[in-house]
Amino acid sequence: MVKNAFISVISQEENRGSVEFQVVIFTNKIRRLTSHLEFHRKDFLSQRGLRKILGKRQRLLSYLSKKDKVRYTELISQLDIRELTTR
């Protein structure tokens, strides 16, 4: 498990309450939990936590795509995650 594989996209002076910062933090947690679940497949509580964090990140990305499409596309490309699919 890689514990120190963090994404340093946001500068230190960035507002910690901003949507971009929160999405980066959630992405770090998701990648850490994913690597944990590769070794511990039956850890169902961690699977539940992963699903909750994925939902939170999806809601934040949806909000950002509605408010500022340019910042949304930049963040998606920096974090190397898939774009939201609309229903």
UniProtKB/Swiss-Prot annotation:
Q: Which key words are in the record?
A: Chloroplast, Plastid, Ribonucleoprotein, Ribosomal protein
Location relative to the cell: Plastid, Chloroplast
| Highest taxon of the lineage | Eukaryota
- NCBIfam families found in the cross-reference section: S15_bact
Mind telling me which PANTHER family this protein's record contains?
RIBOSOMAL PROTEIN S15, BACTERIAL AND ORGANELLAR, SMALL RIBOSOMAL SUBUNIT PROTEIN US15M
| InterPro entries listed in its UniProt record | Ribosomal_uS15, Ribosomal_uS15_bac-type, uS15_NS1_RNA-bd_sf
Biological process (GO) annotations held by this record are: translation
Main localization of the protein described in the UniProt heading? plastid
Chloroplast: is it a keyword of this entry? yes
* A cellular component annotation (GO) from this entry: ribosome
The UniProt family comment states: Belongs to the universal ribosomal protein uS15 family.
Q: How is this protein named in the record?
A: Small ribosomal subunit protein uS15c
Gene3D superfamilies, per database record: S15/NS1, RNA-binding (1.10.287.10)
The organism named in the record is Oenothera argillicola (Appalachian evening primrose)
Give the HAMAP family listed for this entry: Ribosomal_uS15_B
Molecular function terms from GO: structural constituent of ribosome
Gene assigned in the entry: rps15
The record's subunit annotation is: Part of the 30S ribosomal subunit.
